[in-house]
């Protein structure tokens, strides 16, 4: 398709992609602030502003490896058309809105990946999929919550041993301050990993239309607009999912909140540097369960945690189905 002729559609699709990025911040804001809110270190309105700031500046600390994975590591960029991107975004957005309405902390990341896969399959079948990249990402579905779980569990055991001689009041006071650091780190990881997914979508769209020349890369203006969109979404993040993530799964004190956020942040930092588009929802949920289980196994509301896990597994196929149906329906009229 000629790049000039596609310009109005291109602008509209970029706007839809940025809307998804905004929804990502809105939907996943809870991941960054759930623990600091549930421990009452910050009120929700101040916590979202804190998280939004660190979401925005995340591009200063990470490369663009995740954007490259989304742009050319899930589906073959040579088969990408505006309709493929449109369908992928619709699949992800519809699923995100549905889970946000019901307060279900599903993964925006895997909704987007599912949307891409569904649209790619609808266009050219299995040949559209970069199976090595997809399998690596699906593997991260299982690994990220487990890593978050074990890191948070290890941290809570180490910290509990180090502060065993301190009074509960002194420990609480110390970790109320430390949670500002851990929440900042987690918000950096959230902004660094999640915003890059939309960067990859916009960049591959530009590449498919000939705006990037012969080599795939992410323009700086795409980086800035995506970071701004996710930060703005975080600023308007909803309390429904904050409440689920921060208090319904397990009750947290400041020390536990610090360990959960730090374990989650380490996982996100490593994944972002490796170019793996993991789920911030999976990561922080695993970490929260880890600190709850360290207290006692019964401290975790396993029934609710199980419902969340089911939502994780449903997300990719559900978004893929919505995306594929969108592609086939629109294609009938083109």
What are these regions (language model features)?
Residues 1-334:
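Multi-pass alpha-helical transmembrane bundle typical of ion/small-solute transporters
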